[in-house]
């Protein structure tokens, strides 16, 4: 059995927990320790429930509070050599990251807490952006947020997953008719920004397989999406792909508040 919880998912901040009931990891550090402590305590948990932090990329909504994490709770921070180099220069992390720095190898697998971890690169306009495949005997979870477009490698690794957390950031009609300037719209939708609902739905058709038990849609835009639009697009894709066979559970993750604590079983 795996346990999954989103503490915040969107441009306001990103932080997720994945564990097995005995140990776990955080993915990203975009919320304050005060909020994290509160949300953990509401589930009867504390900082001892995770032994490491994984970082997906160096945008501020994913690392805003990583410096205080390093200073105050001193958990090892795992990410790629490219991202650790960027964090060593970033004004929010440079004074604290050295004591917690652990490099993931350029190729192959790493043991991080209870998980065997594989990272993979995804297109996004950060220094580098990665997704993670986390494997234990209790199941395999793939996390990919802030994805400009879906790559063949990401699809292949997601097809091995029992549980999938993936971006469904914006509705194209809302984006194009909304208040954003042209340059920002293009940054979002031209392949190195974010994944639209339709792109997420198309990816799910390629990814879904009989062993996929749950899909969580993350990083929904506040201004250019709604949970219903994201859910409906991906639900229809799963209906079409599964053709009456059993479908994975589908959920959208809230932007600024924690999700429920999900128990994940293969």
Annotate each PLM feature:
Residues 64-73, 88-91, 225-232:
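Metal-dependent catalytic neighborhoods of phosphoester/phosphodiester hydrolases
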Residues 1-43, 130-146, 163:
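Conserved beta-strand hairpin/beta-sheet module of binuclear metal-dependent hydrolase folds
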């Amino acid at each position: 059995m795996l346990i999954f919880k989103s503490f915040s998912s969107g441009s306001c901040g990103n932080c997720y927990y994945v564990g097995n009931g005995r140990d776990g990891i955080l993915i990203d550090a975009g919320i304050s320790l005060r909020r994290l402590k509160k949300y953990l305590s509401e589930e009867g948990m504390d900082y001892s429930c995770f032994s490491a932090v994984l970082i997906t990329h160096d945008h501020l909504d994913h690392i805003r509070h990583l410096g205080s994490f390093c200073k105050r709770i001193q958990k090892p921070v795992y990410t790629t050599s490219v991202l650790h180099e960027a964090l060593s220069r970033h004004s929010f992390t440079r004074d604290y990251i050295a004591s917690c720095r652990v490099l993931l190898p350029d190729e192959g697998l790493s043991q991080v807490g209870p998980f065997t971890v594989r990272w993979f690169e995804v297109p996004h306009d950060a220094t580098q952006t990665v997704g993670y495949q986390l494997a234990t005997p209790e199941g395999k979870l793939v996390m990919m947020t802030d994805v400009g477009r879906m790559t063949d490698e990401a699809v292949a690794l997601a097809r091995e997953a029992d549980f999938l957390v993936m971006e469904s950031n914006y509705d194209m009609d809302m984006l194009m008719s909304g208040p954003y300037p042209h340059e920002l719209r293009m940054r979002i939708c031209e392949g190195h920004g974010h994944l639209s609902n339709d792109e997420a739905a198309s990816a799910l058709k390629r990814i879904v397989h009989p062993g996929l038990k749950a899909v969580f849609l993350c990083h929904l835009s506040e201004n250019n999406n709604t949970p219903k639009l994201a859910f409906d697009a991906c639900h229809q894709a799963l209906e079409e792909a599964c053709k009456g066979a059993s479908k994975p559970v589908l959920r959208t993750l809230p932007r600024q508040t924690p999700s429920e604590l999900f128990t994940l079983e293969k």
